[in-house]
Amino acid sequence: MVVLKYFFVILVNFSFTASIGHAYFQARLPKEVFDVQEPSSRIEGEPGSMSYRVRDCRKVSVTNLRRRIVNTSIQEWAYFGFEIYDLTDTRDDNPNYKREPWRRPVVDSAEALRVADSIAGYWSSTPDSAWILERQNQSWNLRGGDSRWRNPWSAAFVSWVMCESGLGDFNRFQRSVAHYSYIDQAIMSRATANSVSAFVAFDVGEKLIEPGDLLCRGSRPEYQTLAERRSQIGVGARTHCDIVIKLDSDKKRILLIGGNVRAWVRLKILPADFSNQGFLVPVPYNGRRLFAHLKLQADEVENGVFENSPSVQNLLCGGYDFYLPGIIDENSVKCVLQVKD
């Protein structure tokens, strides 16, 4: 597996900022370019005394729901410094890959402080999470404001993205501190007539995967199929889901963005192959298997939605000298005027 950090040379645009940790991140775009309420704006106070200022979701048009989910995820990835977690060489059928022992990720202290209120903002979108923030405040007071988060925040990240994308109604998306809550909602929606759930659950390979969909795995238990989870619906489980950003058929890989991926918001690259139906589907990797495909019930978008996103357009067309090999081909990207969604 490869964890990559890309560095950017700053030219004339102030939407990039250099952190003390020497990684460059892209500030969130002005609202007139992309109208997203920053997660940090939902928080009051400093590490050790943070509290929620906003808990609900504002009303956002869902006309371009799939595109907005993708664009919102990409903007957060940019704010966290364009970190990449490449797992393509860890596919289980790679004879040259040897699984490495797990090591706790190390986050730069200055960077941890910079994004603390953003992660707290993700938590604010989930119900019954006040105790988590209070626990974190206690940890910060004891260990310092740059100490790691005590609770995994990947489900909070997904919940905030959906909240900010217009899925504030719990009947549409069950925002939660744990992924299994909205996985179960998507499972039940498939068997429920007239369900208004934004996602419907399928086994991986059963349906075409598109940008804006969710792909999920289980670690405790290690679910292999959707039926295994269906038999335990409502029971707590340690699961993880990421948001699909791009299907790369030429290189047989799927690009996703998730929270708390190695303690950060990262772009994850998974190995893939074509199914018998001709779909590009993820293959087992690093001893893991995805068991659920949560398909978004929304209009399709072009597969180039990644390159066309406001954050990537700002990177490619904003006058920067950048280095992002193997992810974006700048020669194939057209600079277009972005309209606020």
Named regions from a protein language model:
Residues 1-6:
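Positively charged n-region of N-terminal signal peptides that target proteins for export
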Residues 7-15:
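Bacterial N-terminal signal peptides
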Residues 18-23:
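Sec/Tat signal peptide C-region and signal peptidase I cleavage site
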Residues 25-170, 314-341:
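N-terminal capping segments
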Residues 79, 161-164, 168, 221-223, ...:
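Short loop/turn segments at secondary-structure transitions that flank enzyme active sites
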Residues 85-88, 172-174, 227-228, 267-269:
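Short, solvent-exposed loop/turn and secondary-structure capping segments
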Residues 175-262:
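...with weaker cross-activation on analogous glycine-rich loops/strands in unrelated enzymes
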Residues 260-341:
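Low-complexity, Gly/Ser/Thr/Pro-rich intrinsically disordered linker/tail segments
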